[in-house]
Regions:
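An N-terminal, well-structured beta->alpha segment
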Residues: 1-63, 68, 87, 137-170
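N-terminal small/polar loop signature for handling phosphorylated ligands or for N-terminal nucleophile
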Residues: 31, 38-102, 185-245
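Glycine-rich phosphate-binding loop
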Residues: 86-101, 224-246, 251, 294-333
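Phosphate-binding and adjacent anionic-ligand microenvironments
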Residues: 269-447
C-alpha cells in the first residue's frame, strides 16, 4: 500500500508535506520519470512557494530539466504538459482542501496522473536516488505564457461568434483561487458580460471554502437571482472542478454539469463515454440516447484518464463536476467546461438544457473516519449489504457499490480526506434519502 500517495497524488498539512518531504519526493518522482524534462506548476496557497522551491531543488538534483510554469490552474498545467511534450509534471496544489493543506499532483508524459498503485513504485525510490553529477545540473527555465496558450487552444474549439452575438451575462465566483488567472479573461474575450466575486487569489481563502458545494456558494446564488444573470459559475481552488447556478438561481450539481457536457459533446461527435462508479446514471442515460457506450472506472482521475488514453472515448467526467475533454488533455478541465456550457446557453437557457438530462435525486453525505478505521467500515458495509441481497460490487479496495432497481448507493473511503463518502441516487427523493441514511448510520457505528 502506498504510504503517501492517495487517489490523486499526495496531500497534507505543512507538518506532513513540508519542504524536506517535498525535496525527497521530487527526487524520487524525477528518477521515476528517468530524470527527463519536467514541468512544475503551483496554485496560490500560502505554502506554495516554499514547496515549489523544494520540488525544483529535488528535480534539479536528480538531474531533471525543469520548466517552471509559475501559478496556473491545474487544467492549464496539464494542457501545457501535452503541448510541450514534457516527460512529467508536478502540480503543487491541494485542490479544494482547506487553506492549511497542500500537496503534489503528479502526471506522466501521456497525461495520466499517478495513481496510488504507481505512487507505491515512486515511494520505493524515496531516499534512494542517485544525485546528478555537479557538471550535469541544468538551469531552471521559466514559462510565463501558459494561460494565453491554453486560452487560444480553447477558443479554437469553440464558436466565439455565437457567444459574441448573444453576449450572455455571467457571474463568476472564483473562490479566491487560481481560476482568476484565466477564466475572467477567457469569457471576456469570448464576448460575455461578466461580474466576478472572490476574484483575487488569496491563500487564506477569505471569500468562501474552496470546495464549490451548494452551501458554500450562497452569495453567488443570491447574486444570480438579483441581477437576473444568465448563469453563475463556481470553481474549486485549482480549477478542475466546476458547478453552475442556472438563470433561475438553482444550484446545478456536478453530476448534472457532467451529464450536460456529455450531451453537448455527443451532439457533435459520437464515441465512448468514461465515468466513475460514483457518478449519476444520468450520464449513462444520455450516452444511451446517442447509442454510445459508457465505460465505468474506479473513483479517481488517474483511472479515468488511463482508460481515455488507451481507448476511443470522446469525453470523460465524474460526479464532482470534473469533465475531461481529450482534445485538450486527459485532465479534468473546469475552464473549458465553463466555456462550452456558456456557448450552449447562447442557444437556450441553462434550465432548458437541464430538462434534457434524465432526473435523478442525489443525496451525498460524509462520515468522519480515521485512516485506521476505513477498512473496518468497508468490511462492515460489505457484510451488511451482501446479507441483504441485490448487486453488491467492490471497486478497488476503497469502494462498495450496491445496486437496486432504479437506485444505487456507493460507500467510499476518501483518498484525500479522513472520511467515508456516501452517495445515493434514486428516482424519488425519499428513496435516495432512506438509502443514504441506512448506510450513514451503519458507517457511523463502525467508524
Ligand atoms: Mg481540484
Amino acid at each position: 500500500m502506498a504510504k503517501y500517495f492517495g487517489t490523486n497524488g499526495i496531500r497534507g498539512t505543512l507538518e506532513d508535506v513540508g519542504p524536506a518531504f517535498a525535496l525527497q519526493a521530487a527526487q524520487a518522482i524525477g528518477a521515476h520519470f528517468k530524470c527527463g524534462r519536467m514541468l512544475v506548476a503551483r496554485d496560490h496557497r500560502l505554502t506554495g512557494e516554499l514547496l515549489r522551491n523544494a520540488v525544483v531543488a529535488g528535480l534539479q538534483s536528480a538531474g531533471c530539466e525543469v520548466i517552471d510554469l509559475g501559478i496556473t490552474t491545474s487544467p492549464t498545467a496539464e494542457f501545457m504538459l501535452g503541448k510541450m511534450k514534457a516527460d512529467g509534471l508536478i502540480i503543487i496544489t491541494a485542490s479544494h482542501n482547506p487553506p492549511e493543506y497542500n500537496g503534489l499532483k503528479v502526471v506522466d508524459g501521456k497525461g495520466i496522473s499517478v495513481s496510488k498503485e504507481r505512487g507505491e513504485e515512486i515511494e520505493k525510490l524515496f531516499g534512494n536516488v542517485k544525485l546528478a553529477d555537479f557538471g550535469s545540473i541544468k538551469p531552471v527555465q521559466g514559462h510565463g505564457t501558459s494561460a494565453r496558450e491554453h486560452m487560444d487552444a480553447m477558443k479554437a474549439l469553440l464558436h466565439p461568434d455565437r457567444i459574441a452575438k448573444r453576449k450572455p451575462f455571467i457571474i463568476l465566483d472564483l473562490g479566491n483561487g487560481t481560476t482568476a488567472t484565466i477564466a475572467p479573461q477567457l469569457l471576456k474575450e469570448l464576448g460575455c458580460k461578466i461580474l466576478t466575486i472572490n476574484s483575487h487569489m488569496d491563500g487564506h481563502f477569505p471569500g468562501r471554502p474552496s470546495e464549490p458545494l451548494e452551501q458554500n456558494i450562497q452569495e453567488l446564488i443570491r447574486m444570480v437571482k438579483e441581477t437576473k444573470a444568465d448563469c453563475g459559475i463556481a470553481w474549486d481552488g485549482d480549477g478542475d472542478r466546476i458547478v453552475f447556478v442556472d438563470e433561475k438561481g438553482n444550484f446545478v450539481v456536478g453530476d448534472k454539469v457532467c451529464a450536460l457536457s456529455v450531451l453537448l459533446k455527443l451532439k457533435e461527435k459520437n464515441g465512448d463515454v468514461v465515468t466513475t462508479v460514483a457518478t449519476s446514471k444520468a450520464v449513462e442515460d444520455v450516452a444511451s440516447k446517442f447509442g454510445c457506450k459508457t465505460i465505468y472506472t474506479r473513483v479517481g482521475a488517474p483511472y479515468m484518464s488511463d482508460v481515455m488514453a488507451n481507448g476511443k472515448a470522446v469525453i470523460g467526467g465524474e460526479e464532482v463536476g470534473g469533465v475531461i475533454w481529450p482534445e485538450l488533455s486527459l485532465a479534468k478541465d473546469g475552464i473549458f467546461t465553463a466555456a462550452k456550457i456558456v456557448e450552449a446557453i447562447c442557444e437556450k437557457p441553462l434550465s432548458a438544457w437541464l430538462k434534457e438530462i434524465p432526473a435523478y435525486y442525489n443525496v451525498k453525505t460524509r462520515v468522519e473516519c480515521s485512516e485506521k478505521r476505513k477498512k473496518a467500515v468497508l468490511d462492515g458495509v460489505w457484510d451488511h449489504a451482501t446479507s441483504k441481497g441485490g448487486r453488491v460490487i467492490r471497486h478497488g479496495d476503497d469502494a462498495i457499490r450496491i445496486d437496486q432497481v432504479d437506485s444505487w448507493v456507493i460507500i467510499r473511503a476518501s483518498g484525500t480526506e479522513p472520511c467515508i463518502r456516501i452517495f445515493g441516487e434514486a428516482k424519488s427523493k425519499d428513496k435516495a434519502e432512506a438509502l443514504v441514511k441506512e448506510y450513514e448510520k451503519l458507517a457511523r457505528s463502525l467508524a
